Amino acid sequence: MNCAIIMAAGRGSRMKVNKNKQFILIQGKPILAYTIDKFQRSPLIDEIIIVAAESEINFCMQEIVYKYKFNKVKNIVSGGSERQQSVMNGLKAVKSANIVLIHDGARPFVDNKIIENGIKYAEKYGGAACGVQPKDTIKIKSEDGFSEKTIDRSKLFCVQTPQCFKYDSILKAHINAEKEGILATDDTMIFEMSGNKVYLYDGSYENLKITTPDDLYAAETLLKKNSIQ
Protein backbone atom coordinates (compact mmCIF):
# COMPACT_ATOMS: atom_id res chain seq x y z
CA MET A 1 0.00 0.00 0.00
CA ASN A 2 1.23 3.49 -0.91
CA CYS A 3 0.12 6.55 1.04
CA ALA A 4 0.49 10.22 0.10
CA ILE A 5 0.78 12.70 2.97
CA ILE A 6 -0.15 16.18 1.76
CA MET A 7 1.27 19.01 3.85
CA ALA A 8 -1.24 21.88 4.00
CA ALA A 9 -0.74 23.41 7.45
CA GLY A 10 1.68 26.21 6.53
CA ARG A 11 0.53 29.83 6.47
CA GLY A 12 2.83 31.15 3.75
CA SER A 13 3.55 34.69 4.95
CA ARG A 14 5.49 35.46 1.75
CA MET A 15 2.26 35.25 -0.25
CA LYS A 16 1.00 38.39 1.57
CA VAL A 17 -2.61 37.25 1.77
CA ASN A 18 -4.88 36.77 4.78
CA LYS A 19 -5.57 33.10 4.09
CA ASN A 20 -3.69 29.82 3.79
CA LYS A 21 -1.95 29.95 0.41
CA GLN A 22 -3.19 26.44 -0.39
CA PHE A 23 -6.78 27.72 -0.37
CA ILE A 24 -6.12 30.49 -2.89
CA LEU A 25 -8.25 29.97 -6.00
CA ILE A 26 -6.76 29.52 -9.45
CA GLN A 27 -9.44 29.53 -12.13
CA GLY A 28 -12.04 29.03 -9.40
CA LYS A 29 -10.39 26.02 -7.75
CA PRO A 30 -8.17 25.91 -4.62
CA ILE A 31 -4.49 25.18 -5.15
CA LEU A 32 -4.76 22.30 -2.67
CA ALA A 33 -7.52 20.68 -4.72
CA TYR A 34 -5.29 20.60 -7.81
CA THR A 35 -2.54 19.00 -5.73
CA ILE A 36 -4.72 16.32 -4.15
CA ASP A 37 -6.24 15.50 -7.53
CA LYS A 38 -2.84 14.39 -8.87
CA PHE A 39 -2.59 11.71 -6.17
CA GLN A 40 -6.30 10.87 -6.37
CA ARG A 41 -5.85 10.05 -10.06
CA SER A 42 -2.68 7.99 -9.64
CA PRO A 43 -3.41 4.24 -9.73
CA LEU A 44 -0.37 3.66 -7.50
CA ILE A 45 -1.73 5.73 -4.59
CA ASP A 46 -4.04 3.84 -2.24
CA GLU A 47 -4.78 6.50 0.35
CA ILE A 48 -4.19 10.16 1.09
CA ILE A 49 -3.73 11.89 4.43
CA ILE A 50 -3.92 15.67 4.65
CA VAL A 51 -2.14 17.62 7.37
CA ALA A 52 -3.89 20.94 7.96
CA ALA A 53 -4.08 23.67 10.58
CA GLU A 54 -6.54 22.58 13.26
CA SER A 55 -8.75 25.60 12.62
CA GLU A 56 -8.98 24.71 8.91
CA ILE A 57 -9.69 20.98 9.11
CA ASN A 58 -13.46 21.37 8.74
CA PHE A 59 -13.08 23.80 5.83
CA CYS A 60 -10.64 21.44 4.15
CA MET A 61 -13.02 18.51 4.56
CA GLN A 62 -16.14 20.34 3.39
CA GLU A 63 -14.80 22.66 0.69
CA ILE A 64 -12.11 20.42 -0.79
CA VAL A 65 -12.43 16.72 0.08
CA TYR A 66 -16.23 16.43 -0.11
CA LYS A 67 -16.72 19.06 -2.79
CA TYR A 68 -14.27 17.46 -5.22
CA LYS A 69 -15.08 13.87 -4.19
CA PHE A 70 -11.56 12.88 -3.15
CA ASN A 71 -12.44 9.43 -1.86
CA LYS A 72 -8.82 8.40 -1.35
CA VAL A 73 -8.52 10.94 1.48
CA LYS A 74 -8.86 8.81 4.61
CA ASN A 75 -7.96 11.34 7.28
CA ILE A 76 -7.20 15.00 7.93
CA VAL A 77 -4.95 15.58 10.92
CA SER A 78 -3.80 18.77 12.59
CA GLY A 79 -0.34 20.14 12.02
CA GLY A 80 2.26 21.04 14.62
CA SER A 81 4.13 24.25 15.35
CA GLU A 82 6.86 23.23 12.87
CA ARG A 83 6.67 21.36 9.57
CA GLN A 84 8.64 18.49 11.08
CA GLN A 85 5.99 18.00 13.76
CA SER A 86 3.27 18.21 11.13
CA VAL A 87 4.91 15.42 9.12
CA MET A 88 5.18 13.32 12.26
CA ASN A 89 1.45 13.78 12.89
CA GLY A 90 0.79 12.65 9.33
CA LEU A 91 3.03 9.60 9.69
CA LYS A 92 1.28 8.59 12.92
CA ALA A 93 -2.06 8.71 11.10
CA VAL A 94 -0.94 6.11 8.55
CA LYS A 95 -2.52 2.78 9.45
CA SER A 96 -0.66 0.58 6.99
CA ALA A 97 1.75 1.47 4.19
CA ASN A 98 4.83 0.24 2.43
CA ILE A 99 5.77 3.56 0.82
CA VAL A 100 4.80 7.08 1.94
CA LEU A 101 5.09 10.12 -0.29
CA ILE A 102 5.38 13.42 1.58
CA HIS A 103 4.29 16.29 -0.65
CA ASP A 104 3.76 20.05 -0.38
CA GLY A 105 0.12 21.06 -0.68
CA ALA A 106 1.19 24.16 -2.61
CA ARG A 107 2.95 22.13 -5.31
CA PRO A 108 0.08 21.31 -7.71
CA PHE A 109 2.04 20.55 -10.88
CA VAL A 110 3.53 17.23 -9.82
CA ASP A 111 2.97 14.70 -12.59
CA ASN A 112 2.28 10.98 -12.56
CA LYS A 113 5.78 10.10 -13.79
CA ILE A 114 7.30 11.83 -10.76
CA ILE A 115 4.92 9.93 -8.46
CA GLU A 116 5.65 6.59 -10.15
CA ASN A 117 9.42 7.09 -10.06
CA GLY A 118 9.30 8.18 -6.43
CA ILE A 119 7.59 4.95 -5.43
CA LYS A 120 9.91 2.86 -7.61
CA TYR A 121 13.10 4.36 -6.20
CA ALA A 122 11.85 4.35 -2.60
CA GLU A 123 11.12 0.64 -2.92
CA LYS A 124 14.60 0.07 -4.33
CA TYR A 125 16.69 2.39 -2.14
CA GLY A 126 14.53 3.10 0.91
CA GLY A 127 14.34 6.84 0.26
CA ALA A 128 14.05 9.04 -2.83
CA ALA A 129 13.37 12.67 -3.67
CA CYS A 130 12.77 14.45 -6.94
CA GLY A 131 14.32 17.73 -7.96
CA VAL A 132 16.14 19.70 -10.61
CA GLN A 133 19.59 21.14 -11.20
CA PRO A 134 19.89 24.92 -10.71
CA LYS A 135 19.87 26.99 -13.89
CA ASP A 136 21.75 29.95 -12.44
CA THR A 137 25.39 30.29 -11.47
CA ILE A 138 25.70 29.68 -7.72
CA LYS A 139 28.07 31.78 -5.61
CA ILE A 140 29.18 31.69 -1.99
CA LYS A 141 28.74 35.20 -0.62
CA SER A 142 31.01 36.59 2.10
CA GLU A 143 29.69 38.40 5.16
CA ASP A 144 30.83 41.71 3.69
CA GLY A 145 28.91 41.11 0.46
CA PHE A 146 31.58 39.86 -1.93
CA SER A 147 31.74 36.68 -3.99
CA GLU A 148 34.05 34.12 -2.39
CA LYS A 149 33.61 31.13 -4.65
CA THR A 150 31.64 29.76 -7.58
CA ILE A 151 30.05 26.37 -6.97
CA ASP A 152 30.00 23.68 -9.66
CA ARG A 153 26.26 23.59 -10.29
CA SER A 154 26.48 20.17 -11.96
CA LYS A 155 26.89 18.78 -8.44
CA LEU A 156 23.96 20.75 -7.00
CA PHE A 157 20.35 19.61 -6.81
CA CYS A 158 17.27 21.64 -5.89
CA VAL A 159 15.09 19.18 -3.99
CA GLN A 160 11.34 19.23 -4.56
CA THR A 161 8.53 17.00 -3.34
CA PRO A 162 7.26 14.33 -3.21
CA GLN A 163 9.91 12.89 -0.95
CA CYS A 164 9.30 9.16 -0.82
CA PHE A 165 10.33 6.59 1.78
CA LYS A 166 9.70 3.16 3.13
CA TYR A 167 7.20 3.89 5.86
CA ASP A 168 8.89 2.08 8.74
CA SER A 169 12.24 3.72 7.95
CA ILE A 170 11.02 7.33 7.78
CA LEU A 171 8.87 6.88 10.89
CA LYS A 172 11.90 5.57 12.79
CA ALA A 173 14.01 8.47 11.50
CA HIS A 174 11.43 11.00 12.70
CA ILE A 175 11.20 9.34 16.11
CA ASN A 176 15.00 9.49 16.41
CA ALA A 177 15.05 13.16 15.41
CA GLU A 178 12.36 13.96 17.96
CA LYS A 179 14.27 12.20 20.75
CA GLU A 180 17.52 13.96 19.88
CA GLY A 181 15.96 17.40 19.46
CA ILE A 182 16.96 17.67 15.81
CA LEU A 183 15.08 20.25 13.75
CA ALA A 184 15.55 19.67 10.02
CA THR A 185 14.44 21.63 6.96
CA ASP A 186 12.95 18.63 5.17
CA ASP A 187 12.43 14.88 5.42
CA THR A 188 15.46 13.89 3.37
CA MET A 189 17.64 15.58 5.99
CA ILE A 190 15.93 13.65 8.80
CA PHE A 191 16.32 10.41 6.84
CA GLU A 192 20.02 11.07 6.23
CA MET A 193 20.65 11.92 9.89
CA SER A 194 19.53 8.39 10.75
CA GLY A 195 22.28 6.96 8.55
CA ASN A 196 20.19 6.43 5.42
CA LYS A 197 20.83 7.47 1.83
CA VAL A 198 18.36 9.30 -0.38
CA TYR A 199 18.30 8.63 -4.12
CA LEU A 200 17.79 11.82 -6.15
CA TYR A 201 15.80 11.54 -9.37
CA ASP A 202 14.54 13.96 -11.99
CA GLY A 203 11.63 16.16 -11.05
CA SER A 204 10.44 19.01 -13.23
CA TYR A 205 10.96 22.76 -13.43
CA GLU A 206 7.18 22.99 -13.68
CA ASN A 207 6.81 21.22 -10.32
CA LEU A 208 7.05 24.56 -8.57
CA LYS A 209 5.97 25.38 -5.03
CA ILE A 210 3.60 28.33 -4.92
CA THR A 211 5.16 30.55 -2.26
CA THR A 212 5.09 34.14 -3.55
CA PRO A 213 2.76 36.28 -5.71
CA ASP A 214 5.17 35.72 -8.62
CA ASP A 215 4.76 31.96 -8.19
CA LEU A 216 1.00 32.40 -8.28
CA TYR A 217 1.26 34.22 -11.60
CA ALA A 218 3.52 31.46 -12.96
CA ALA A 219 1.03 28.83 -11.76
CA GLU A 220 -1.85 30.54 -13.55
CA THR A 221 0.23 30.59 -16.73
CA LEU A 222 1.10 26.89 -16.37
CA LEU A 223 -2.52 26.06 -15.70
CA LYS A 224 -3.61 27.68 -18.94
CA LYS A 225 -0.76 25.99 -20.81
CA ASN A 226 -1.46 22.50 -19.47
CA SER A 227 -5.24 22.85 -19.18
CA ILE A 228 -5.27 21.16 -15.77
CA GLN A 229 -8.78 20.56 -14.50
Swiss-Prot record:
One of its GO terms (biological process) is isopentenyl diphosphate biosynthetic process, methylerythritol 4-phosphate pathway. Keywords: Isoprene biosynthesis, Nucleotidyltransferase, Transferase. GO terms for molecular function: 2-C-methyl-D-erythritol 4-phosphate cytidylyltransferase activity. Gene3D superfamilies: Spore Coat Polysaccharide Biosynthesis Protein SpsA, Chain A (3.90.550.10). Its EC number is 2.7.7.60. Pathway: Isoprenoid biosynthesis; isopentenyl diphosphate biosynthesis via DXP pathway; isopentenyl diphosphate from 1-deoxy-D-xylulose 5-phosphate: step 2/6. The record marks R14, K21 as: Transition state stabilizer. InterPro entries: IspD, IspD/TarI, IspD/TarI_cytidylyltransf_bact, ISPD_synthase_CS, Nucleotide-diphossugar_trans. The record marks R153, K209 as: Positions MEP for the nucleophilic attack. It comes from the Bacteria. The keyword Nucleotidyltransferase applies. Pfam families: IspD. It catalyses: 2-C-methyl-D-erythritol 4-phosphate + CTP + H(+) = 4-CDP-2-C-methyl-D-erythritol + diphosphate. Catalyzes the formation of 4-diphosphocytidyl-2-C-methyl-D-erythritol from CTP and 2-C-methyl-D-erythritol 4-phosphate (MEP). Belongs to the IspD/TarI cytidylyltransferase family. IspD subfamily. This is 2-C-methyl-D-erythritol 4-phosphate cytidylyltransferase.
